[in-house]
Amino acid sequence: MRKFFILLLTLLSILLHGCSFDFNNGDNSENNVDNTLGKDYYDELHTENLYDDLFDLKNKIEIKVNIKETEIKKIEEDFQKYGSEGNIYRVADSLQITITYPDSYTSVYKIEDIGIRMKGNTSRHSFYNNGIRDFIHFKISFQETFDDEKLYKKSELISWDSLEERENRKNRTFFGLRALELKYNAEGDLTYSKDVYASKIYREYGVLAQQTTIGILNMNIGNKSSLSGTLGLYKIYEPLDRIFIKRNFPKNNNDGELYKATWGSAKGMPTLNTKSSKSYGVDDSMPGETKSVSYDLKTNKKKSNHQNISNLLNWINSSSKDISNEVSKYIDEDSFITWLAIMYLSGDWDNFMYDSNNFFMYFDESGICYFMPFDMDRTFGLLSKHRGMATIKPLDKYNLQGDNNRSNLLKKTIDVKGSVIQKKYLERIKEISTGVLNKDKFEEVYYNIYNNYKDDVRPTIQTLEYRYETDVDQNTFYHLIHEELITLNDSTNYNYTYSEYIKQKQRIVDRNIGWY
């Protein structure tokens, strides 16, 4: 089957141009990468095979970014000038992904002229001074055109030979994706497994969530060995975007409206506690400006009249104190209840329920809303000892931002004593708790990661001014929290081990569910 797959790729390479590939046994050198494969062959027959291979934990992934020193300096300059509101993509010459399969067979894929920028909200910080000095999160775009006069200086603008060529770039994909998100281990998760496991659990129980895996990040800066090397292990995330929707919904229902709940908007936290039409739309903020909306439309930007989100917000913020019986008119009820149950069981304090944060809403073509989590890096005991997440009860009304920020959607459904949604929520927790809080399933994820990467944790970039951290405190929360090992014993003053966490959480579930 694999030989047939290679033959298909070879035939396609004769017809197309723009990306590259190589298959080999043991030799991954960049010199062996064939530069003849097509501009968008990932939209052909084998797209999903490559996508699946990228996120298969049994496979070992290495991502290599080739970038000029002048361009990586611009990423630092953008942070210094704009802080967390500087989402300007800079040019990387190429990105190469190497997949090593369990049988040691390797495949190498390369794409040229990509966009790269810093990612995050409060996690952004200075990282470059005559070399990479600190870890940061990155966002990679395969579709950036670099021709927006509002963002780029005249000398930086790319001139496209034709509208067709520019349109091809705007539709270009790699591994069936338009972008990638790369995050370092900011939370000090020495298992490197908890948010990978969280995304897997959501999908297992029918909630749409981004695919997540682990890989080695290699930065080649100006072909200078003194500046280049690995940044150790990074988490690799599938973005939630129009391609994600088309991959996960049938053709007759995948052209709806996708909104991102934005943190730090000028219109307030995305609590769903407003009817205001000014809270939603297309974010038109420029670098350095606060985001202009709380719910940022990511698809159908030109044709949407925002009626679906308006209907949802008007319903949630009506005068009714109990809207449980009407949930299915506006929301996919089953996945909504499961989403809430897993949020509780995973102890994720940086989500919709506990922090009014980190969720998307997709309105399908009939107007029904599907909630989708993302950024699940504070789950299953990560940074949760001081939040009490292992011992919080299913109906506790905790919100990190204060009581006023608890969503009216929660207040009028699971908070209503004896309501139909509260009953279903508690039943769902009881039903899935042993499957979510499952040591065997977690360790399957962990040992796939451990076996592939146990010797690759320590970065090799010489300029990194990094120290080994054995704990996390509030002052160094987002700084160089890195160890040179992968271990199940990741307990600190702020982190529970997975075993500690699930033991306490299951005890709380068993003691409390029957009392409500």
Model-derived features: where do they sit?
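Beta-rich nucleic-acid/ligand-interaction surfaces
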Residues: T213-G229
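Internal "kinase-insert"/substrate-recognition segments embedded within catalytic cores
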Residues: F146-D147, L163-L180, Y184, Y205-Q210, ...
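Short, well-structured beta-strand/strand-turn elements
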Residues: Y205-N218, N351
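Sec-dependent signal peptide recognition
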Residues: R2-L9
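Regulatory N- and C-terminal appendages and interdomain linkers associated
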Residues: C19-K119, Y447, N451-Y516
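Middle-to-C-terminal accessory/interaction subdomains
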Residues: K60, E71-K73, K291-M353, N358-Y516
